[in-house]
């Protein structure tokens, strides 16, 4: 199902729906999960990436690619207790978790990043996992006071784009700190 500015994916067997919408703010998406029957468990969102680099990335000194050889690639998290914490992807050697109301978690690079943006309405368990078969993973689960309760839906926000300070300051607390990694 497709509309103006959104795509809806439906699993006819389970009734699960996923609607991906482009928000008015550039570089930001809303991903809404909904199941009319409910699902046992916690809402979650996760991003995956490899350690690979763009095929057109210059790395040869003579071609002007010296800076790209040491370009920072990591994961960053912002929580109510820590405004900004970052670690290089290759330094993540064990699973890491932190609980926080609001905040965000992101894969960061020198000029661009992809961030899952939390809401002040929920408590998140942000996680980062070490590399497994060439893939890095990070994301969150949404915590609930109702243990084992049914979940019918959740809306996630995803930012994928450039690090422009004035733009990032309007999206989420401390998001602009990813610029000064």
Spell out what each predicted region is:
Residues 1-180:
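Soluble non-transmembrane domains of integral membrane proteins
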């Amino acid at each position: 199902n497709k509309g103006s500015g959104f795509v809806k994916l439906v699993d006819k067997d389970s009734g699960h729906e996923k609607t991906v919408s482009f928000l008015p703010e550039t570089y930001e998406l809303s991903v809404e999960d909904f199941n009319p029957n409910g699902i046992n468990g916690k809402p979650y969102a996760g991003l995956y990436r490899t350690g690979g680099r763009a095929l057109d990335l210059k790395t040869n000194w003579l071609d002007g690619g010296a800076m790209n050889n040491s370009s920072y690639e990591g994961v960053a998290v912002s929580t109510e207790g820590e405004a900004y914490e970052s670690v290089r992807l290759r330094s993540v050697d064990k699973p890491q978790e932190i609980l926080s109301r609001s905040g965000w978690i992101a894969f960061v690079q020198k000029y661009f990043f992809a961030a899952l943006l939390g809401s002040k309405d929920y408590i998140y368990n942000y996680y980062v996992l070490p590399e497994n078969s060439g893939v890095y993973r990070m994301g969150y689960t949404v915590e609930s006071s109702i243990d084992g309760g049914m979940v019918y839906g959740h809306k996630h926000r995803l930012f994928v784009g450039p690090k422009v300070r004035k733009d990032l300051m309007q999206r989420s607390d401390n998001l602009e700190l990813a610029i000064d990694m």
